Amino acid sequence: IGAIAVAPSDPNVVYVGTGEGNPRNNASVGDGMYKSIDGGEHWTHIGLTKSDKIARLIIDGRNADVVYACVLGREWGPNEDRGVFKTTDGGATWKKVLYVDPNTACSDISADPDNSNILYAGMYTYRRWAWHLESGAGNTAVYKSVNGGASWERLSGPDKVNGLPRTAMDRIGVAVAPSDPNIVYVLSETKTEGELWRSDDAGKSWRTVNRDPNINF
């Protein structure tokens, strides 16, 4: 199990994403998404069968049928079933709403606690071989959506001047503060630009708050 989430609007509705959310050389592979509507007594498989690994789930605070799945995808090679997927019908159908390329996965996702249309996602380029792990760089970056995933803005990269890294990033963690949705944290490993960043204006600008390499995601 890589992710589990309980619907804020109905605690009997539980979603589970299978497969480990951390790409290790012995990580377990899953077979997609499961859902319970009776507090875990019974479960139904609800798709994303080729996702392999699901790292995080976000459920809309008011509508238990709206769910975002942060999918790592296949560890040992490229695949199309990775990125951010969304359902608006409780898992009957899924739509891929954030996709970069076959080697770039979703490593983490977080939402404004008062408005799940506002999302932050970490997209992570990685691939494992038996003798090597390619982790980070490539198209690894932080993204934001303000319309429920219909469109996304890339917040980090060499063309951005907002306080987030402009050089290569590794696996990304993101978190919106429950107490204040304007406060957002990004955790990643870089060679020279820090490890933990904070925004106090909903992602417009960022500052480094920790450079300790021991806290990488």
Model feature map: region roles:
Residues 1-217:
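Beta-propeller blade termini and top-face loops
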